Regions:
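Alpha-helical coiled-coil scaffolding segments
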Residues: 1-224
Length: 224
């Protein structure tokens, strides 16, 4: 595995920043639980609860709608590694190249590798209607957001941090898909907390998207 290459890539994206790690653990845990709850379970500590591979395999089954190979139920380390490998092999079968994420790191509870794996799963399975092959998954997600929000005043999505601080991009995405849920014309850049809370409340109540982000965190952090 080329750990150096992966770490450099994650460093550019801010994934190695301690504040990012804390926020992403919270966000990714909420995302995982929004799917795992459909199978009657959940996780609490993201780097611990995927270590035996069972909930990781279950998560992939829930979000893909496809069965994975039968998991090993043994408690030994090699059973856990076998289960995580089944999950990783499934992800790779979907055309995702896992540069440096190995089963051992997940079984050992490596926070950075676990977050990187979940981020990879989100990009591959949560954003499926973008097929610009030459772009990275992150760039495809950015392009999708730009396309959806292009018609809206005061929205200019250039990144995944400062472009979202005033809440208008979130509101624009909701309005683009469900215009009856909010009146975009009444929103202003001057009230970011209102915009963010409105978007998150509507997403949770009407779109079944769990509230994963905190409006105050986004508004007051230098680079959310």
């Amino acid at each position: 595995y080329d750990y150096t290459q992966q770490e450099e890539e994650w460093d550019r994206e801010g994934l190695l920043d301690p504040a990012w790690e804390k926020q992403q653990k919270k966000t990714f845990t909420a995302w995982c639980n929004s799917h795992l709850r459909k199978a009657g379970t959940s996780i609490e500590v993201i780097e611990e609860d995927f270590r035996n591979g069972l909930k990781l395999m279950l998560l992939l089954e829930v979000i893909s709608g496809e069965p994975l190979p039968r998991p090993d139920r043994g408690k030994m380390r090699f059973h856990k590694i076998a289960n995580v490998n089944k999950a990783l092999e499934y992800i790779e079968s979907k055309g995702v190249k896992l540069v440096s994420i190995g089963a051992e790191e997940i079984v050992d509870g490596n926070v950075k590798m676990t977050l990187g794996l979940i981020w990879t799963i989100i990009l591959r399975f949560a954003i499926q209607d973008i097929n610009v092959e030459e772009l990275s998954a992150r760039d495809r997600l950015l392009l999708w957001c730009q396309r959806k929000t292009a018609p809206y005043d005061n929205v200019n999505v250039q990144n995944f941090h400062t472009s979202w601080k005033d809440g208008l991009a979130f509101c624009a995405l909701i309005h683009r898909h469900r215009p009856e849920l909010l009146d975009y014309s009444k929103l202003t850049k001057a009230d970011p907390l209102h915009n963010l809370n409105l978007a998150f409340e509507i997403a949770e109540k009407h779109l079944d998207i769990p509230r994963m982000l905190d409006a105050e965190d986004l508004v007051y952090s230098q680079k959310p």
